[in-house]
Amino acid sequence: MNMLNKTVGFILNPLFLGMSIIAIGMVLAICRRRKMTIWCMMAAVAWFWFWSMPITGSWLAMPLEKDFPVQLAEDMPTADAIALMGGGVGGSTNYPYAMLRDGADRAWHAARLWRAGKAPIIIPSNVGAELADIRLLTDLGVPKDAVVLETKAENTEENAKFVRDILLGSGGVVEFNSPTHLFIHSPTSKPKVLLVTSACHMKRSLYMFRKYAPEIECIPAATDYQALPWKDEPFKWRHILPDIGAFAHNNSFIHEYIGYYGYKWFR
């Protein structure tokens, strides 16, 4: 299923489709179909322009983020752990510090929740050999003994499964000084997890946790909002002008839709 999602995602990627339109136009030019070639190239320009507009991103991100309003860390409920979805922090074994990328707000928000006393441990998922997430978390004041590594997951489905295994597979969450549980594997309540990820990724992440880790009560703690800054901003011409950064973000939103509906409809 993961390979199918990746294949479909590659085919439906706006960059791939745009290059396909250009390739068709080149074939038509070789075949001396001048009028068709012009129409094809105009379509390619319009296609890339649309997917490069910042305002397109707000249209795409809004449906993904609308169910997860902003919540202050201080107002979040207490839980047994903070599940931190990876992808926002990079690193290198040749460099001693974490390198921040788009989505680094995730690690910041996880540390913010921990410092607010909302859970005793943070479980970063998809941690690479360079352990960049740990480097950033410790820089933000989280001690190493409050970080429980999950290093095997390669996608969001495995994130959910392996976080579940960490919480339930070694005696229950009581060993983590759980603030919400009194008994190991309590039959009347579930371990609680604050799920931290980008707001546009939350819909898919929450679906995966509820499907593949039903033993866990998952509470969304979204951050890194993309549509929110547009909510009250007046129209500006730059919103409809091409921007390479907007093109990359819009590609990632399409990836979220494919990932979510691919699992929901075909798994």
What are these model-predicted stretches?
Residues 241-267:
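Structured C-terminal subdomain patch of bacterial secreted/periplasmic proteins
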Residues 15-17, 54, 267:
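Extended, histidine- and acidic-residue-enriched regions that form the cofactor-binding/catalytic faces
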Residues 49-239, 243-246:
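A structural signal for short, hydrophobic/glycine-enriched beta-strand patches
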Residues 3-8, 56, 60-64, 254-261:
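Hydrophobic alpha-helical segments of integral membrane proteins
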Residues 29-37:
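Membrane-interface helix-boundary motifs at transmembrane edges
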